[in-house]
């Protein structure tokens, strides 16, 4: 059984517990679909109209606790901090931890999106849904991704266009004033992906791969492993021997994204098998998982810090090469184990500080150069004056950006998702119902 995070009060209803978990997590990393959210909300609304006799006569339904995914927010937060440290030219230098963080972003994105789309696709296949439902599912998928990442990216690019040539050179590393072309940046032209702007086109490109990948895997039914095993071998081979670095096309980074997607497939299949068979972990199962996880963490830390167990136990068998270190397979192994059998590792990453950094990580990633390369802060003679000024101002800037741009964009994406779900299920009368549901939602928020 998958573990869930306790709420603290044993007597709290299961529904409140689920809402707390889902609201605490980033909307895009939540395990719930819009359908489940609607069912929970409508259930509360219907319950208020039932008589007390009906309520007493109804049997209590037991709901499975939501999957524990909060630690992934903490992983994203740590990755954002590592990017800032790498670009600061002052903290944790010499280890290329920024590259590790970028790979972590890529893996998290592909893992979560593959997982969510696969669950949605399995549901549609079980319902024998028609082409109309599949079209709505794809529109919902792409609209959520668009409103999650593009608005802040576009506003940042527009803001850069109004900056002086000196500011563009200082904060986004433009060598010449003519290097910046707003239209080329907004349309992801390859030669206009300066500084941190190079990663978003790669992620968006892979968004189009995920639906094809998921449907291909599901089409193989019980022979899904026939594709997963050789693809896993290929990912490891490419990660070890292929050169990858920043500001390159998607092709050399496909193994990184694919590692996350393969991990999502393995997790979904294992999760379904565990629930369908009623499998219970015995002590020796847990011991085996912890041994594999411990060895994986040891190798991951050794790769990141270029030593440790490679100096103490065994030299690194992988040939050293320039470019990004290969960590995607190690990260996904840890993710799957923690999702199946959580431990203190996931609990550690559920620390609220890391999870908050994870919530604002996209703003931190795009805007951190305005703080860490600010000449006034950099001119401070004392180390801790610079450190705390950067932390405070970066948190302030990223939080402001999140609540002014990211959060409203996500709400708009969720609103569109609810509208699409209503249109799909109710057809022509859906617009009226959607408006009523929106008013009920707003009323509920006011009462809270």
Where are these regions (language model features)?
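Alpha-helical transmembrane segments and terminal signal-anchor/GPI-anchor hydrophobic tails
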Residues: 251-353
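Active-site environment of divalent metal-dependent phosphoester hydrolases
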Residues: 90-91, 265, 369-374
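Generic helix-packing signal
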Residues: 264, 362-365
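Hydrophobic alpha-helical transmembrane segments in multi-pass integral membrane proteins
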Residues: 301-307, 365-378
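Short, locally clustered residues in the helix-turn-helix/winged-helix DNA-binding domain
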Residues: 118, 340, 371
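Transmembrane alpha-helix segments characteristic
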Residues: 228-232, 332-334, 367
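Membrane-cytosol interface segments of multi-pass membrane proteins
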Residues: 1-242, 249, 253-256, 272, ...
């Amino acid at each position: 059984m998958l573990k869930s995070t306790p709420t603290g009060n044993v007597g709290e209803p299961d529904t409140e517990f689920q809402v707390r978990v889902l609201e605490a997590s980033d909307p895009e990393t939540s395990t719930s679909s819009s359908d489940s959210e609607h069912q929970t909300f409508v259930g509360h609304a219907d319950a208020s109209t039932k008589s007390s006799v009906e309520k007493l006569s109804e049997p209590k339904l037991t709901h499975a606790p939501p999957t524990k995914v909060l630690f992934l927010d903490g992983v994203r937060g740590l990755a954002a901090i590592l990017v800032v440290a790498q670009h600061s030219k002052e903290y944790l230098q010499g280890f290329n931890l920024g590259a590790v963080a970028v790979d972590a972003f890529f893996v998290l994105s592909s893992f979560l999106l593959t997982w969510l789309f696969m669950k949605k696709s399995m549901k549609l296949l079980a319902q024998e849904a028609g082409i109309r439902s599949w079209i709505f599912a794809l529109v919902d998928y792409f609209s959520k991704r668009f409103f999650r990442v593009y608005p802040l990216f576009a506003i940042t690019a527009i803001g850069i266009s109004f900056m002086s040539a000196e500011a563009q050179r200082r904060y986004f590393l433009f060598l010449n004033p003519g290097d910046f072309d707003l239209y080329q940046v907004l349309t992801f032209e390859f030669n206009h992906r300066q500084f941190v702007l190079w990663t978003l086109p790669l992620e968006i490109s892979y968004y189009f791969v995920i639906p094809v990948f998921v449907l291909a895997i599901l089409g193989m039914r019980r022979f899904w492993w026939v594709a997963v095993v050789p693809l896993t071998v290929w990912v490891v081979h490419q990660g070890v021997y292929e050169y990858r670095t920043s500001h390159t096309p998607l092709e050399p980074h496909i193994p990184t994204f694919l590692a996350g997607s393969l991990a999502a497939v393995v997790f979904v299949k294992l999760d379904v098998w565990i629930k369908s068979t009623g499998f219970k972990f015995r002590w020796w199962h847990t011991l085996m998982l912890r041994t594999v996880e411990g060895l994986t963490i040891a190798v991951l830390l050794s790769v990141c810090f270029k030593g440790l167990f490679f100096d103490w136990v065994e030299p690194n068998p992988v040939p050293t090469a320039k470019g990004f270190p290969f960590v995607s397979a190690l990260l996904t192994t840890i993710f799957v184990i923690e999702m199946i059998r959580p431990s203190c590792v996931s609990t550690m990453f559920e620390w609220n500080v890391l999870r908050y950094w994870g919530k604002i990580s996209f703003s931190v990633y795009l805007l951190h150069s305005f703080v860490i390369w600010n000449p006034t802060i950099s001119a401070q003679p004392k180390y801790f004056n610079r450190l705390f000024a950067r932390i405070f101002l970066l948190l302030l800037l990223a939080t402001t950006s999140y609540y002014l741009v990211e959060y409203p964009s996500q709400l708009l994406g969720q609103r569109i998702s609810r509208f699409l779900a209503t249109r799909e299920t109710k057809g022509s009368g859906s617009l009226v119902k959607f408006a009523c549901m929106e008013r009920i939602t707003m009323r509920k928020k006011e009462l809270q």
